[in-house]
């Protein structure tokens, strides 16, 4: 092999400086990114639908089960991310530990998921603002929302992290106040007369619709927890990922579980599952902010401006989701470009370490998705359904990647004691999570399957064959193979020191 010349070395250094992200996320940023990613409109609006569909007991069981699954998956992701803290996170792991074609499909699947999610956030921003300004066209608010999100992402990872820290903090405070106030209401200390536990015994509560009801809630609960993987994506820009990733995995999950389980318990105890407002709150309408279970409970406390307060909180949730969505999508595209799984231009970064071209194409895609909703609503619904199942595919990939990583790590002579963080549940953890992911995926729209509603089934599961086509297409084009255990790159990734 020829010895590199000084010019070769200089060119390599220049190329790395043009494509290298900067580690600017502190420990507090990492923890709030994970929390903020998991607490959003799914909790503030859709949580009521889970109680309506499964009863208070069924909703609690569903969220606890999905929470367990996510815990196992985050343990797996934490082990790999602390060992190899790269921006591509699980997509890089899928490429290294499964096959390049699977990683390729997983990366583009994840990027498209967040690009369309940002588009959905643009739609939601217009709906929320219509609560206060019904006569103003929704596209005006969407443009303003997009400008804010792009501005927060365009400066640096640290600015993004700081914005997400405070946006997530608002949501955390509201949920804590909600849960504690709910406990006081149940105890009869404040608000109207306490219903006690009567709402757990009306009708066929606590398990309305039985096992079928729990399965129906699995998908809602699963979507609610999506976003916790952002801590893995952000590992590539963490100041100290070997410390902060495990810390975030260990502490953040239990906080998220407290928020969800606590909120669902309060909603199911204070509001009967037969209340029609619980279902209508999940519909896409500005008027239904007043039907949010959070709004209903706050109103019972005597807070007259409950709807306006929750509207403001939901707006911050949408901004937080859009902020994180643009961040995650642009980092994923940047990571794939470094592996030549996306056009090389997307690997370029600004002096602040921001992948500007990757961010730009994500922004344009989100804007087009928003435009599609305005003109072709049916097409937009299909887009949303395509990405709806992508989170489950991502989780499946994490489980398989971890199993193969651990096997290769030991086969190649490495010691478990040298891992910065070790999942305490291996090998049962990723196996159980894998099976649960399959159950959640199968139950995505079981009613349509049972009733033979072909169009609904196709709309719900279209993401699966599309993922398969991308996976197989890359496999055929590149003639790749499943990476043998002995050839896997499981060596620890060197971390350059952070300078301020």
What residue spans do the PLM features occupy?
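Membrane-interface "cap" regions at the ends of multi-pass membrane proteins
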Residues: 1-48, 52-57, 70-75, 87, ...
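Helix-loop-helix junctions that connect adjacent transmembrane segments
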Residues: 12-22, 60, 137, 169-311
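Extracellular loop-to-transmembrane helix junctions
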Residues: 21-22, 46-141, 145, 151, ...
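Membrane-helix boundary/coupling elements in multi-pass transport proteins
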Residues: 86, 109-124, 220, 225-238, ...
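TM-loop-TM module centered on a large, flexible mid-protein loop between adjacent transmembrane helices
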Residues: 92, 99, 131, 217, ...
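Membrane-interface loop-to-helix entry segments
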Residues: 126, 139-197, 226, 249-253, ...
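C-terminal membrane-solvent junction of multi-pass transporters and transport-like membrane proteins
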Residues: 166-167, 346-356, 395-455
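A generic transmembrane alpha-helix motif of multi-pass inner-membrane proteins
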Residues: 185-186, 381-394, 423-500
């Amino acid at each position: 092999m020829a010895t590199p010349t000084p010019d070769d070395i200089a060119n390599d250094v220049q190329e790395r400086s043009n494509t290298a992200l900067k580690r600017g996320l502190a420990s507090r940023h990492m923890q709030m990114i994970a929390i903020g990613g998991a607490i959003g409109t799914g909790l503030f609006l859709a949580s009521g639908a889970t109680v309506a569909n499964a009863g208070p007991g069924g909703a609690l069981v569903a969220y606890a089960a999905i929470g367990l699954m996510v815990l196992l998956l985050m343990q797996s992701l934490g082990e790999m991310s602390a060992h190899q803290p790269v921006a591509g996170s699980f997509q890089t792991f899928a490429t290294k530990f499964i096959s390049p074609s699977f990683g390729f499909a997983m990366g583009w699947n994840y990027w498209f998921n967040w690009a369309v999610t940002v588009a959905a956030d643009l739609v939601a921003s217009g709906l929320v603002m219509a609560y206060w300004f019904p006569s103003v066209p929704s596209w005006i608010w969407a443009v303003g929302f997009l400008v804010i999100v792009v501005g927060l992402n365009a400066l640096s990872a640290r600015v993004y992290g700081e914005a997400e820290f405070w946006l997530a903090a608002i949501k955390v405070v509201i949920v804590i106040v909600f849960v504690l106030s709910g406990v006081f209401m149940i105890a009869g200390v404040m608000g109207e007369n306490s219903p006690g536990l009567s709402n757990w015994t009306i009708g066929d509560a606590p398990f309305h619709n039985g096992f079928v009801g729990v399965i129906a809630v699995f998908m809602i609960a699963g979507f609610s927890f999506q976003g916790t993987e952002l801590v893995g994506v952000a590992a590539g820009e963490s100041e100290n990922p070997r410390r902060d990733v495990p810390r975030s995995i260990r502490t953040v999950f239990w906080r998220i579980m407290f928020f969800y389980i606590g909120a669902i318990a309060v909603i199911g105890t204070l509001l009967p599952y037969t209340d029609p407002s619980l279902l209508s709150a999940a519909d896409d309408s500005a008027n239904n902010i007043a039907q949010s279970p959070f709004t209903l409970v706050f109103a019972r406390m005597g807070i007259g401006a409950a709807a306006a307060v929750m509207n403001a909180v939901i707006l911050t949730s949408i901004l937080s989701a859009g902020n994180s969505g643009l961040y995650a999508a642009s980092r994923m595209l940047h990571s794939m470009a470094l592996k030549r799984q996306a056009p090389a231009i997307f690997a370029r970064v600004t002096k602040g370490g921001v992948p500007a071209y990757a961010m730009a194409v994500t922004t344009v895609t989100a804007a087009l998705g928003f435009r599609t909703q305005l003109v072709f609503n049916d097409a937009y619904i299909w887009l949303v359904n395509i990405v709806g199942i992508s989170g489950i595919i991502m989780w499946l990939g994490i489980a398989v990647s971890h199993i193969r990583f651990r096997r290769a790590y030991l086969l190649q002579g490495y010691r478990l004691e040298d891992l910065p963080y070790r999942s305490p549940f291996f090998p049962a953890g990723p196996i159980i999570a894998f099976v649960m992911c399959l159950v959640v995926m199968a139950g995505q729209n079981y009613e349509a399957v049972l009733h033979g509603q072909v169009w609904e089934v196709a709309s719900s599961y279209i993401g699966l064959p599309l993922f398969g086509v991308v996976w197989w297409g890359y496999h055929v084009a590149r003639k790749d193979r499943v990476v043998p255990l002995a050839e896997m790159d499981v060596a620890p990734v060197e971390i350059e020191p952070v300078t301020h």
